[in-house]
Every structure is written in structure tokens, then in C-alpha cells.
From Swiss-Prot:
Belongs to the Holliday junction resolvase Hjc family. Mg(2+) binds at residues 12, 42, 55. The record marks 57 as: Transition state stabilizer. It is an enzyme of class 3 (hydrolase). It comes from Sulfurisphaera tokodaii (strain DSM 16993 / JCM 10545 / NBRC 100140 / 7) (Sulfolobus tokodaii). This is Crossover junction endodeoxyribonuclease Hjc. It catalyses: Endonucleolytic cleavage at a junction such as a reciprocal single-stranded crossover between two homologous DNA duplexes (Holliday junction).
Length: 144
């Protein structure tokens, strides 16, 4: 496994572990480098009926992050079919941020990109957890 895939897998396992610790049901579904033809996000997490999908990218520096058109459209379709909300998880040195996938812009070539400035404005893991928890519907009975 090359260092980029190894680093990405390590970040994915870290996110899965942290979300599990926060009460999520989580699976890691890495497809990078596999013979899978369908595109699925790296992480699928559920909590009380709320579904989040996370595509993870890891970089050593602040370069732009690109996602190929076919992959981006495939995981967007997966999100649509599942009813989940799609995020890009970006790991940079000393920073892990989550950005709504809709924040990516499409390039002239049809691929998708996000710059460091937008990544820096993303949510930290705790913010993502609070975001999901704010979407959990609670009935009056749950307070009794």
C-alpha cells in the first residue's frame, strides 16, 4: 500500500473510532484501489435515523483537493439513494475538517475541487457530531 493510501486509511479508521465513541453506528467502506465499479463514500455513519456519508482525503500540505467527476457523481448518487448527507473529510497536518460536499466547486474539466481556505472554515469532528445531534427528532415522550 502506498503512503497516500496508508495515510488515508489511518484517517478513516480514526474517524470511525471517534464517531463510534460518540454513539454512531459506523462502517468503513473503502473502495479506493479495489475492483469495485460502484462509487461509495469511505465512511457511512448513522445515529438515531440520521445518516452521514464521508469521503475522506488526506494531504501533507495545503494544496487544493480534487475529486474526479465520476467518483464525485457516484457518491452523490449514493447519498441521494440513501437519504444521507454527504461530507468531505479533509485531514491536513494538525487539522481535520468536515465540509458539506455541496461546497466543492466543479472545475472546467468537470472534476470537483476545494481550496484550503474553504477547508479551514469546515467543521471539526465535535461540530459534526453536534450538527447530527441537532437533526435527531425527539418526541415529547423522550423527555419524560
Amino acid at each position: 500500500m502506498n503512503s497516500n493510501k496508508s495515510r488515508g486509511s489511518s484517517v478513516e479508521r480514526y474517524i470511525v473510532s471517534r464517531l463510534r465513541d460518540k454513539g454512531f453506528a459506523v462502517i468503513r467502506a473503502p473502495a479506493s484501489g479495489s475492483k469495485r465499479k460502484d462509487h461509495v463514500p469511505d465512511i457511512i455513519a448513522l445515529k438515531s435515523g440520521v445518516i452521514i456519508l464521508i469521503e475522506v482525503k488526506s494531504r501533507k500540505n495545503g494544496q487544493k483537493i480534487y475529486i474526479e467527476k465520476e467518483q464525485a457523481e457516484g457518491i452523490r448518487e449514493f447519498a441521494k439513494r440513501s437519504g444521507g448527507e454527504l461530507f468531505l473529510g479533509v485531514k491536513l497536518p494538525k487539522m481535520l475538517r468536515f465540509i458539506k460536499f455541496d461546497m466543492l466547486r466543479q472545475t472546467e474539466g468537470g472534476n470537483y475541487a476545494i481550496d484550503l481556505e474553504t477547508v479551514e472554515k469546515g467543521m471539526e469532528l465535535e461540530d459534526l457530531v453536534r450538527y447530527v445531534e441537532s437533526k435527531i427528532s425527539r418526541t415529547l415522550d423522550s423527555f419524560l
